[in-house]
């Protein structure tokens, strides 16, 4: 991301949860960020539980050995998605040989101590490989495979815009600075629907740009330029 690196403050997180509570019971900690980097990840999980939310964490898994004791027994934690494919593009990680061993140890510990679901993601298949989705490896442990996709980018080639997406229907994202965007792929905040620190979440949902996106996809059309340059959206057209 080109945005300034920063950690969401605990007070801001509490405010966001109070705003979104009428609309969902589930939180997903990601959006082009590594949630296990946050120094207060345990506090965030505690607050989530206090306010009645279940949490899904998406991580590349490299920090699991360091922070597992802060998260593994938290009652709010519902599922951990581990992006195995992230290792393919991480040239700076010095412990690749130990990576899978640490993941396996973590899975064993999770199964012994909790009911948390583990999803191992391998989203780097090429077109010659047919993915098998939702392979059950063990109780509450799954392997999910899929093709590589291109992240939306205003500099990318634009398609005809025809198609559907679940953005704003079953997901919405709040960035660290409070910017609200339609989905977790808009990590740069290009489609800025408003700021949850400045406007009520209910007002942002009723905003003209928000409504235009929803109505557009109801007609099978992407009204936003970034959406017309999103490779992930094409998955829903198959």
Regions found by a protein language model. Name each.
Residues 95-109:
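Well-ordered, non-membrane alpha-helical segments in soluble/globular domains
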Residues 166-168:
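Short, small/polar residue-rich loop motifs at catalytic or cofactor-binding pockets
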Residues 174-175:
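Short, acidic, Ser/Thr-enriched surface-loop or helix-capping motifs
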Residues 60-61, 83-87, 123, 185:
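Histidine-centered beta-alpha loop that forms part of the nucleotide-sugar donor binding/catalytic region
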Residues 17, 21, 68-89, 132-151:
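Structural recognition of alpha->loop->beta junctions
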């Amino acid at each position: 991301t080109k945005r300034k690196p920063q950690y969401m403050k605990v007070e801001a997180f509490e405010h966001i949860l109070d705003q979104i509570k009428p609309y969902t019971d589930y939180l997903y900690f990601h959006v082009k960020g590594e949630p296990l980097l946050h120094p207060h990840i345990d506090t965030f999980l505690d607050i989530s539980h206090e306010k009645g939310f279940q949490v899904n964490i998406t991580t590349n898994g490299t920090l699991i050995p360091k922070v597992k004791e802060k998260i593994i027994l938290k009652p709010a934690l519902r599922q951990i998605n581990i992006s195995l494919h992230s290792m393919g593009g991480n040239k700076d990680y010095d412990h690749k040989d130990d990576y899978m061993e640490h993941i396996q140890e973590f899975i064993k510990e999770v199964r012994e101590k909790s009911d948390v679901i583990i999803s191992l993601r391998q989203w780097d298949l090429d077109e010659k490989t047919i993915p098998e989705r939702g392979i059950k490896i063990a109780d509450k442990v799954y392997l999910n495979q899929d093709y590589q996709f291109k992240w939306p980018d205003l500099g990318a080639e634009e398609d005809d815009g025809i198609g559907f997406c679940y953005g704003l229907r079953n997901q919405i994202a709040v960035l660290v600075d409070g910017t609200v965007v339609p989905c977790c792929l808009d990590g740069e905040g290009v489609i800025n629907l408003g700021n949850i620190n400045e406007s009520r979440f209910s007002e942002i949902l009723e905003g003209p740009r928000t409504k235009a996106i929803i109505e557009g996809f109801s007609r099978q059309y992407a009204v936003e330029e970034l959406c017309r340059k999103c490779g992930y959206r094409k998955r829903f057209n198959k």
